[in-house]
Amino acid sequence: MRKINILLLLAIVALTYSCNETTNTTPDTLTDTANEQKSIITMLDSFNSAAAKADYKTYFNFYTEDAIFAGTDATERWDKKAFMVWAKPIFDKGSAWNFTALERHIYFDKSGTLAWFDELLNTQMKICRGSGVLVKQGNEWKVQQYILSTTVPNEILDSVIKIKSTIEDSIINNLIR
């Protein structure tokens, strides 16, 4: 009887450990994350380069079909199709916008198929912040959502608020009606 109890106890312990989900924290996982991060850095640099070259097709190929773009103006929130319509005349002039990353932070969800980032950009508007959500589709990372924000130094924020108040008060009033 005692041998049966010991065998039963060992079987329960073995079953318990075999059923536990483990997270792979081997160097391979770290390598995969580093490789995915490099892939995203390359993708974002190419994304910005396509806009600088006014390569309309390549630039918009970086977006998912149901992507959202939010620009620096409070009225600029477009799905991909609307953003393409808005941007087409700008790209047709032969130069769109030229953004260069100054600093970039990239994060991943546990599945490794969703990432989000924020970056400081050197632009014609001076320093802007880009942030977004990326999804992995096949072997490619695609922009699901991108938000472009201008930065305003705290020392001059009160002056900027005064300048934009009339325009944005009108937008606020339209939105709360």
What are these regions (language model features)?
Residues 127-157:
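Short beta-strand edge/turn micro-motifs at domain boundaries
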Residues 1-31:
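Bacterial Sec-dependent N-terminal signal peptides
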Residues 68-78, 89-96:
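A short gly/proline-enriched turn/hairpin at secondary-structure junctions
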Residues 63, 73, 103, 110, ...:
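A mature extracytoplasmic/lumenal domain signature
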